[in-house]
């Protein structure tokens, strides 16, 4: 019976501990407003001066707004266990770092706003777990890199992706191509210089694509653009229309953009940046016939090259055209040469063979191609045995040449034959363009009058040397048919082309027509065997004169030291004077007569100790009187 009262006392406590009752809501963070009375729960902390995500968040919240604060990082534990969160706003903070897996528990999240922060990169693990994300806003950050797998978890659900106002030079285009449900893609105000062909071909639901203010010079045709009509303004456009914005890019208006010019547009502000004839003109006002390309022209290629087996070899090929041609190489066996363990192909047209073998010899073909055509050139490579060793101390000099070494003189027979051989394998040379005289640093170019071409405004000379890729231009008046090229480098091969710039009577536009090309070589700088140059003599004379002066000073110092020692350590002219004598003690035998001469010395004998008495008196000279 004693148990019954105890049970009656415990009955009021039972409902409080029942699992069916809802848990006590967490306290609302300081400076925040919380909506917990009705579903969905929300925590609103905009502009609250927060330095980090509040730890006392209600984990049941469906909406969390932390915009306009000073949050610098999102840690793994900040948003843990918030499985019901649908909307998260972290806009306009100072976020620099997002921990890997920071959003891993937000599997129900649909909208994530990270715009207006300081993110510099987005890795593969930072957005992990967002399997239901539809809106991702990353604009106004400092993003310079986007990992290829950063959007893998939300690739099938993402509908809105905003990457505008960042520092992106490259994008994972393959990953973007997997966003099959994306409706809006914002790539404007970045540093994108190119878009690969077919990058948007699988974005079937794309309705708006913004690529405004990038560095795009061309936009490749895409199947998506050909299927849907293009309208510049979304207002009044049909449901299936694609809104494409690409203004503010330095468009190069050539034949590669004809497909875009043919599409129907309402209005936009795109303009051409190049070529110079179309620069600054409204894109949609340029006629289709003005979108032209120029076929490639090979301006430089390596002369016949001979290397010993086992040594590296570099084959060079340069070409110009509009658009810039792409250079490829074909081996003597007819195979396309690419990057491998023995060869490297560079975008500038250089093919480097790291280690040559006897089987590498033959004719290599350089193929330069662009949208307007292609051009080829052959380069001969000979692989032979190593050359005989040369003496390291051997010296040689070239015989002097009459006159100035840089004067224009006809080439020698050897150089003429070498130039003729190079011309046979070089680019086609027009007989109308001739380099009649060339020395070590100058060459005279001549071409005939181009009467068949009406309305010539000027001539243009293009040339470059075998040692660099810089193409030099010279504009010549229309009434001139020769030009002296100066400031050339000695011992180099130059490829030169002359073009006529004229006004096309049919279209009224400026056009160019090649007059011809030529190849020539400047003579090497000679080392004369005569007397050394004046600067050399002047330096030698200065050194010799300085040596003479130094030697004279040393001799003078030596003489002074010797004289100083001879005079007993006193300067010359100041010899030591004899000390004054006050008295002299003389030994006498009782008389003051003249002192007899001393006897001859006798052999020394032992002396006994004797006492000698001295009579001393003041000394007087003999010529003075002794009395008054």
Swiss-Prot record:
Protein name stated in the entry: Leucine-rich repeat and fibronectin type-III domain-containing protein 3
Lipid bilayer topology: Single-pass type I membrane protein
Organism lineage string: Eukaryota, Metazoa, Chordata, Craniata, Vertebrata
Compositional bias annotation for Basic and acidic residues: 617-628
Gene name per UniProt: LRFN3
Transmembrane portions of the chain: 541-561
Species this chain originates from: Ailuropoda melanoleuca
PROSITE patterns: FN3, IG_LIKE
LRRCT domain segment(s): 249-295
Biased composition range(s): Low complexity: 406-429
Disulfide bonds: 317-366
Family statement drawn from the similarity comment of this UniProt entry: Belongs to the LRFN family.
Alphabetical keyword list: Cell adhesion, Cell membrane, Cell projection, Disulfide bond, Glycoprotein, Immunoglobulin domain, Leucine-rich repeat, Membrane, Postsynaptic cell membrane, Repeat, Signal, Synapse, Transmembrane, Transmembrane helix
Biased composition (Pro residues): 595-604
Span of domain LRRNT: 19-59
């Amino acid at each position: 019976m004693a148990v019954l009262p105890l049970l009656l006392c415990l009955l009021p406590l039972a409902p409080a501990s029942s699992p069916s009752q809802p848990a006590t809501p967490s306290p609302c963070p300081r400076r925040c407003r919380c909506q917990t009375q009705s579903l969905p729960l929300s925590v609103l902390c905009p502009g609250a001066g927060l330095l980090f995500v509040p730890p006392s968040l209600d984990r049941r919240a469906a909406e969390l707004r932390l915009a306009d604060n000073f949050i610098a990082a999102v840690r793994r534990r900040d948003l843990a266990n918030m499985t019901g969160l649908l909307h998260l706003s972290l806009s306009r903070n100072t976020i620099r770092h997002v921990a890997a897996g920071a959003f891993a528990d937000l599997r129900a999240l649909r909208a994530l706003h990270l715009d207006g922060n300081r993110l510099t990169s987005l890795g593969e693990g930072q957005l992990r777990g967002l399997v239901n994300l539809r809106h991702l806003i990353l604009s106004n950050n400092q993003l310079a890199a986007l990992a290829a797998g950063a959007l893998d978890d939300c690739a099938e659900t993402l509908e809105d992706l905003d990457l505008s106002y960042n520092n992106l030079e490259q994008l994972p285009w393959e990953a973007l191509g997997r966003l099959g449900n994306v409706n809006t893609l914002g790539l404007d105000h970045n540093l994108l210089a190119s878009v690969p062909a077919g990058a948007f071909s699988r974005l079937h639901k794309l309705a708006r694509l913004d690529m405004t203010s990038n560095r795009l010079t061309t936009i490749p045709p895409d199947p998506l653009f050909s299927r849907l009509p293009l309208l510049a303004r979304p207002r009044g456009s049909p449901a299936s229309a694609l809104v494409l914005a690409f203004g503010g890019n330095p468009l190069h208006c050539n034949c590669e953009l004809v497909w875009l010019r043919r599409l129907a547009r309402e209005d936009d502000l795109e303009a051409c940046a190049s070529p110079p004839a179309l620069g600054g003109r409204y894109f949609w006002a340029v006629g289709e016939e003005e979108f032209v390309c120029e076929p490639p022209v090979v301006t430089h290629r390596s002369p016949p090259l001979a290397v010993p087996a086992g040594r590296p070899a570099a084959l060079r090929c340069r070409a110009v055209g509009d658009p810039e041609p792409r250079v490829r190489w074909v081996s003597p066996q007819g195979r396309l040469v690419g990057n491998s363990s023995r060869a490297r192909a560079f975008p500038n047209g250089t093919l480097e063979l790291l280690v040559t073998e006897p089987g590498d010899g033959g004719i290599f073909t350089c193929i330069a191609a662009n949208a307007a055509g292609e051009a080829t050139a052959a380069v001969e490579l000979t692989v032979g045995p190593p050359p005989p060793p040369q003496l390291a101390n051997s010296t040689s000099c070239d015989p002097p040449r009459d006159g100035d070494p840089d004067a224009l003189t006809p080439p020698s027979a050897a150089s003429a034959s070498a130039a003729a051989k190079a011309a046979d394998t070089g680019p086609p040379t027009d007989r109308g363009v001739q380099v009649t005289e060339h020395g070590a640093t100058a060459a005279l170019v001549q071409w005939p009058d181009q009467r068949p071409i009406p309305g010539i405004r000027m001539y243009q000379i293009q040339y470059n040397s075998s040692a660099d890729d810089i193409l030099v231009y010279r504009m010549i008046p229309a009434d001139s048919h020769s030009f002296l090229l100066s400031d050339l480098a000695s011992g180099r091969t130059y490829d030169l082309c002359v073009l006529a710039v004229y006004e096309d009577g049919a279209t009224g536009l400026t056009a160019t027509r090649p007059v011809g090309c030529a190849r020539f070589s400047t003579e090497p700088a000679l080392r004369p065997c005569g007397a050394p140059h004046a600067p050399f003599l002047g330096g030698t004379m200065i050194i010799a004169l300085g040596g003479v002066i130094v030697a004279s000073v040393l001799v003078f110092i030596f003489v002074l030291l010797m004289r100083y020692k001879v005079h007993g350590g006193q300067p010359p002219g100041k010899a030591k004077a004899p000390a004054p004598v006050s008295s002299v003690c003389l030994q006498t035998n009782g008389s003051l007569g003249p002192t007899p001469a001393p006897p001859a010395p006798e052999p020394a004998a032992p002396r006994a100790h004797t006492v000698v008495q001295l009579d001393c008196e003041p000394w007087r000279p003999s010529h003075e009187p002794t009395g008054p």
